[in-house]
């Protein structure tokens, strides 16, 4: 059985084609195509611009995916699309494309929860069985565990998502959005040496990122770190090296120091709430999914915690961590095989589609 998946909940448009062999063997990725709308440095992406991008590229990506997978329309069994959560305008653009293909090709629709798509793709790629899931992206921050055919949310952000915090700070520093602001912050953080004190807000298994963002934005403004004086910053980086200075703490922090401090603080918060969830459900596995899950420092910190508990951490690379169509095809096919269908009249989008709102019929 073959499913085509369309993802477009934010600025990334993805089309994926997944094969589930009839003999029940491991599913195969036949195509995984993605195109990203990139906004100028210092700016975020607006829903209307992202939707326009998706409308302009979706047909091209579908044709390219079919060619790469070497399948015809007749081979496709179902069309899966992101029903939510996400930004309204881009979600609607992809939903319209999915409905159009359904009518043109005579194939049934399967609406997929974006978060469940991340989880199921992560489970497939890593081989993890029943992990505590840390779902971290630009729009979501949740600690999840499976129970009684639901992906239960044990903890989440109380305000903005961790990825949104990183993206907005990248705008403050006028860091490039290509290939992604969070990735560029990660690379800059590797050069940081001075840890700046920032707010740390954890409440049980929930956390908050708006306060730390406001604090670090204020620090960046007070130090004049707007990304325009790179020569001076390079000198400060040299001064902050212990090999050249004995009073590191007295040196004005650089952009790299602020990125380093932000990552260390927010990732410590994520590790804490994940460990608490592991203790609660008795799991020794952690699966990190979502765009922020690509961050190597987050994976490293989570790995230290998991190993201390006698457990392990699982994560995927950027092909599957970042929003993609293949995860929608995977989750959609799992639902399709249980008899689930989305009638055309119910193929609307839901911006606040909760992870625990999905009945996971395909798991025991």
UniProtKB/Swiss-Prot annotation:
Lineage: Eukaryota, Fungi, Dikarya, Ascomycota, Pezizomycotina
Main location as per UniProt: cytoplasm
A GO CC annotation given for this chain: cytoplasm
E.C. number(s) listed in UniProt: 2.3.1.234
Gene3D superfamilies reported in the protein's UniProt record: 3.30.420.40
HAMAP family cross-referenced by the UniProt entry: Kae1
Enzyme superclass (EC): transferase
Location(s), subcellular: Cytoplasm; Nucleus
Cofactor note: Binds 1 divalent metal cation per subunit.
Family note: Belongs to the KAE1 / TsaD family.
GO annotation terms (biological process): positive regulation of transcription by RNA polymerase II; telomere maintenance via recombination; tRNA threonylcarbamoyladenosine modification
Ribonucleoprotein among keywords: no
Species name: Aspergillus clavatus (strain ATCC 1007 / CBS 513.65 / DSM 816 / NCTC 3887 / NRRL 1 / QM 1276 / 107)
Source domain of life: Eukaryota
Keywords: Activator, Acyltransferase, Cytoplasm, Metal-binding, Nucleus, Transcription, Transcription regulation, Transferase, tRNA processing
A molecular function GO annotation: N(6)-L-threonylcarbamoyladenine synthase activity
Ligand binding (a divalent metal cation): 114, 118, 135, 323
Needed cofactors: a divalent metal cation
Name this polypeptide is given: tRNA N6-adenosine threonylcarbamoyltransferase
């Amino acid at each position: 059985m073959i499913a085509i998946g369309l993802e477009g909940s934010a600025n990334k448009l993805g089309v994926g084609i997944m094969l589930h062999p009839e003999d029940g063997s491991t599913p195969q990725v036949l195509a995984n195509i993605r195109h990203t709308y990139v906004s100028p440095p210092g700016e975020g992406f607006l829903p209307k611009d992202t939707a326009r991008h998706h409308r302009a590229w979706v047909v091209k990506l579908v044709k390219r995916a079919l060619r790469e997978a070497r399948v015809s329309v007749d081979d496709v069994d179902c069309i899966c699309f992101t029903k939510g959560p996400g930004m309204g305008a881009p979600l609607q653009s992809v939903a319209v494309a999915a409905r159009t293909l359904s009518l043109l090709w005579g194939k049934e629709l399967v609406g997929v929860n974006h978060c469940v798509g991340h989880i199921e793709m992560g489970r497939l790629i890593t081989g993890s069985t029943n992990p505590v899931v840390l779902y971290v992206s630009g729009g979501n921050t949740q600690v999840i565990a499976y129970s009684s055919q639901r992906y239960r949310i044990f903890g989440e952000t109380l305000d903005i998502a961790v990825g949104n915090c990183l993206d907005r700070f990248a705008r403050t520093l006028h860091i490039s959005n290509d290939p992604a602001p969070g990735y560029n912050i990660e690379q800059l953080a590797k050069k940081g040496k001075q840890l700046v004190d920032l707010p740390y807000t954890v409440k049980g298994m929930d956390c908050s990122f708006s306060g730390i963002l406001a604090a670090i934005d204020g620090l960046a403004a007070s130090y004049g770190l707007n990304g325009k004086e790179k020569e001076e910053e390079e000198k400060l980086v040299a001064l902050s090296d212990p090999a050249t200075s004995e009073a590191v703490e007295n040196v004005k922090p650089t952009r790299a120091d602020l990125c380093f401090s932000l990552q260390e603080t927010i990732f410590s918060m994520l590790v804490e709430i994940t460990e608490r969830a592991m203790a609660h459900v008795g799991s020794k596995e952690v699966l990190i999914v979502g765009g922020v899950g690509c961050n190597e420092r987050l994976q490293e910190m989570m790995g230290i915690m998991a190993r201390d508990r006698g457990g392990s951490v699982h994560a995927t690379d950027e092909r599957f961590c970042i929003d993609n169509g293949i995860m929608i095809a995977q989750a959609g096919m799992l639902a399709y095989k249980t008899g689930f269908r989305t009638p055309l009249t119910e193929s609307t989008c839901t911006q606040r589609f909760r992870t625990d709102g999905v009945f996971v019929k395909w798991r025991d």
